[in-house]
Amino acid sequence: MRILGIDPGLRVTGFGVIDVSGHRLAYVASGVIRTPTADLATRLGTIFQGVSTLVREHAPDQAAIEQVFVNVNPQSTLLLGQARGAAICGLVSGGLPVAEYTALQLKQAVVGYGRATKSQMQEMVTRLLNLTGQPGSDAADALGMAICHAHSGSTLGAIGAIGGLAPALAKKGLRVRRGRLVR
C-alpha cells in the first residue's frame, strides 16, 4: 500500500510518500511545495496543483493530512485552514481517501511522545525509513503523517493493524523510552 502524507502550510507544504508492506516501511519520495509571494488565490492554486501532481506521479492508495490547530492568532488559523483545504481538494480530486490526524497523534505514533520536538520527529523518521540524510522539518512531518496513518490500523494490511511500530523499531534495535529513541 502506498500512502501520501501532507503537512499543510501556506508558504511551504511538506509531502512524503511511503510504501507499507506488513511491518515494513519503505521510503518513496519527499519534499516541499513552495508557494510564490503572491495573492492568496495564487498560493492556494499552487498548493492544489502541486498536490494533484503528486497524486498523479506517485499513485498513492491513501492519504493523510494534519488537522488544523487553533492558533493564538485567528488569522493564521484561517489561512492554514485554507491551505489545508486546497491540499485536501488536490487529494480528493485524485480519488484518494483522506485521513486526518492531530499533531499530538502524529508525534505519539512516530516518536512515542506527544510533545516531541521537530528534531526528534526528524530523527525518528530518518531511522524508521533508513534514510541516508535527514529530511527537512516539513518533509519529515509529512513522512511522519504517512507513518502515523500506517500505524493507525485504519489501513488494511498496514503495520498498525498488528502490533504498531514496536516490531519495526525492534528490528532496528530501537525502542522508545520516556519520549526518546534508545537502543
UniProtKB/Swiss-Prot annotation:
Binds 2 Mg(2+) ion per subunit. Keywords: Cytoplasm, DNA damage, DNA recombination, DNA repair, DNA-binding, Endonuclease, Hydrolase, Magnesium, Metal-binding, Nuclease. The active site is at residues 7, 66, 138. One of its GO terms (biological process) is DNA recombination. SUPFAM superfamilies: Ribonuclease H-like. Its EC number is 3.1.21.10. GO terms for cellular component: cytoplasm; Holliday junction resolvase complex. Mg(2+) 2 binds at residue 66. Pfam families: RuvC. Mg(2+) 1 binds at residues 7, 138. InterPro entries: RNaseH-like_sf (IPR012337), RNaseH_sf (IPR036397), X-over_junc_endoDNase_Mg_BS (IPR020563), X-over_junc_endoDNase_RuvC (IPR002176). It is found in: Cytoplasm. GO terms for molecular function: crossover junction DNA endonuclease activity; DNA binding; magnesium ion binding. Its cofactor is Mg(2+). It catalyses: Endonucleolytic cleavage at a junction such as a reciprocal single-stranded crossover between two homologous DNA duplexes (Holliday junction). Homodimer which binds Holliday junction (HJ) DNA. The HJ becomes 2-fold symmetrical on binding to RuvC with unstacked arms; it has a different conformation from HJ DNA in complex with RuvA. In the full resolvosome a probable DNA-RuvA(4)-RuvB(12)-RuvC(2) complex forms which resolves the HJ. The RuvA-RuvB-RuvC complex processes Holliday junction (HJ) DNA during genetic recombination and DNA repair. Endonuclease that resolves HJ intermediates. Cleaves cruciform DNA by making single-stranded nicks across the HJ at symmetrical positions within the homologous arms, yielding a 5'-phosphate and a 3'-hydroxyl group; requires a central core of homology in the junction. The consensus cleavage sequence is 5'-(A/T)TT(C/G)-3'. Cleavage occurs on the 3'-side of the TT dinucleotide at the point of strand exchange. Belongs to the RuvC family. This is Crossover junction endodeoxyribonuclease RuvC. It comes from Burkholderia ambifaria (strain MC40-6).
